[in-house]
Amino acid sequence: MITGIQITKSANDDLLNSIWLLDSETNEARCVVAKAGFEEDQVIAAADLGEYESRDVAIEVPAKVEGGQHLNVNVLKKETLEDAVAHPEKYPQLTIRVSGYAVRFNSLTTEQQKDVIARTFTSSL
């Protein structure tokens, strides 16, 4: 796990107020910023920091943008949905995807059901 710290007290003046990322899995420290003695992104053994006092620093990681698309798919025949509108008692468990979430078809109003059918089954794009 990576944690961020700012060194607030150290016998080494170069470490005072420096900011580090500590990796507990590798026991390494990566310098984020230091006034002297260390380079940005320099990696050292965490033990090489010696004795120090520190405060936690919040680490923000920007969201990773991967792109791509999302597709909701209902694998049904138009006739099945139309029959569910006419005879809801025959389809108590019929679940469809609407706007990214699952919903019981029978819980929709008749108007919503007809809208779903119209949007799902089109003659052209």
Swiss-Prot record:
Q: Which Gene3D superfamilies match?
A: 3.20.70.20
Q: Which UniProt keywords apply?
A: Organic radical
List each copy of the Glycine radical domain by range. 5-125
A GO molecular function assigned to this protein is:
formate C-acetyltransferase activity
Q: Does the keyword ATP-binding apply?
A: no
Q: Which GO terms describe its cellular component?
A: cytosol
Q: Which Pfam families match?
A: Gly_radical
Q: Which residues does this entry mark as bearing Glycine radical?
A: G100
Show the PANTHER family listed in the entry.
FORMATE ACETYLTRANSFERASE, FORMATE ACETYLTRANSFERASE 1
This chain's function reads: Acts as a radical domain for damaged PFL and possibly other radical proteins.
What this protein is called in its record is Autonomous glycyl radical cofactor
